Curated annotation (Swiss-Prot):
The glycine cleavage system is composed of four proteins: P, T, L and H. In this organism, the P 'protein' is a heterodimer of two subunits. Signal peptide: none annotated. GO terms for molecular function: glycine binding; glycine dehydrogenase (decarboxylating) activity; pyridoxal phosphate binding. It is an enzyme of class 1 (oxidoreductase). One of its GO terms (cellular component) is cytosol. The modification N6-(pyridoxal phosphate)lysine is found at K273. Its EC number is 1.4.4.2. This is Probable glycine dehydrogenase (decarboxylating) subunit 2. Its cofactor is pyridoxal 5'-phosphate. The glycine cleavage system catalyzes the degradation of glycine. The P protein binds the alpha-amino group of glycine through its pyridoxal phosphate cofactor; CO(2) is released and the remaining methylamine moiety is then transferred to the lipoamide cofactor of the H protein. One of its GO terms (biological process) is glycine decarboxylation via glycine cleavage system. The gene is gcvPB. InterPro entries: GcvPB, GDC-P_C, GDC-P_N, GDC_P, PyrdxlP-dep_Trfase, PyrdxlP-dep_Trfase_major, PyrdxlP-dep_Trfase_small. It comes from the Archaea.
Amino acid sequence: MFRQAKWDEPLIFELSRSGRVGYTLPKPIEDVEIRVPEKLKRKSPLNLPELSEPEVVKHYTRLSGMNYGVDSGIYPLGSCTMKYNPKINEEIAGHPGVAYVHPYQDERTIQGALKIMWELEGWLKEITGMDRFTLQPAAGANGEFTGVMIIRAYHLDRGETQRTEMLVPDSAHGTNPASAAMAGFKVIEIPSNENGTVDLEALENAVSERTAGLMLTNPNTLGIFEDEILEIAKIVHKAGGLLYYDGANLNAVLGKIRPGDMGFDIVHLNLHKTFSTPHGGGGPGSGPVGVKDFLKDYLPVPLVGYDEESGRYYLDYNVPKSIGKVKELYGNFAVMVRALTYLKIMGRDGLKEASEIAVLNANYLTQKLKGTRGYELPHKELRKHEVVFSAEPMKKETGVKALDVAKRLLDFGLHAPTIYFPLIVHEALMIEPTETVSREELDAYVEALKRISEEAYSNPELVKSAPHNTAVKRVDDVLAAKRPIITWRMYRELKEKGEVDI
């Protein structure tokens, strides 16, 4: 049985002792005059912890023992594609030519960086069937917002101010309706049919002269491919709307089918999902947005261009109808470097094989777990890259909820799946193993879920009170959301008031 390391580890500020140093700056050869205006000079010393290098290393090593990441084991968060991040990505991203380049340099001195961005765009265009990309968005939701702002700008430019409605399936990512609402659209929910795909009749009834577009993930969040996608595209386009592709699940179809060939006009991708760059706490992310040719004039500025005559790359601000910037400078460049490294190492055939293995792994797990008491498999049996089980029968029969199952999995040294999403599946357990998980790891995961099923029916309190073997037990999720303590200053002030007991 797994048992996680547990250290009574203070915050690094609490370990600080005056006078301790980890690095000593060399003395200047001569006196250096620092020409900083008085009004910009600090009035008090900067409050940083003072520790030696060994103390810093020991502190973070101990913390790492109380953590879990993609290098620890299976991390099957559904619709997150938590695949292994190859270490060569980090090696290339840490190259001085990447790490030390500055965004304000003259573009004549950053030709290598611009070439990387140009080549990455070329790969993404080929993979998706789009005609132009911006690499500026910093993450998936930022990319979504960029995409819906382009839809908005397109319709306004055509004088179609009545197009105020964005259609979103009930199985969509939660950020889809949020992004649409932020862009000023009214969100219209489209229900799923008994197969877990978009209800075409409901879609036909929803489209009108007010329709701006439809935001769709394919495969969807149930892991089911929208096999009526060409008809969906026809319905939306006939109504004058645009079709938007949420690229969260692109890992399932790499090299098999392209969003552009399905009829999508706009696509956002997640380099931190599909293309193996770190995300979550290991970020930052990157959410490039691609468009068909008729929408390229609305992309954020600058774009990267290439002059064949001179052989030089350049930053192109000549985008007549641009929606403007969605992030400072040019995007998260080091993430782009990691993604391009992955693409070049994998190649076209490697990407295709990665998708095949991701789909195989999800279906292998599905077939091994289906029929287990307490877990129900809604909709179709065959999935793409992920599967959603329902723990609703277990909850009704034992009182053990999806949350309890997720917490108990931690006691086996395994990361929990996404839970309670998509909302159309009650007590959802959304599992995406990815292609970088072995058969043995899949077997261990299924066995743990089966063991938890046995415990739920024989000793439900054991599951309800889990986890038991982790460094941190159950936390108060509501309090954490209502009163986050995310800085040393906040923590210190609350502790001085006696409002925290840690």
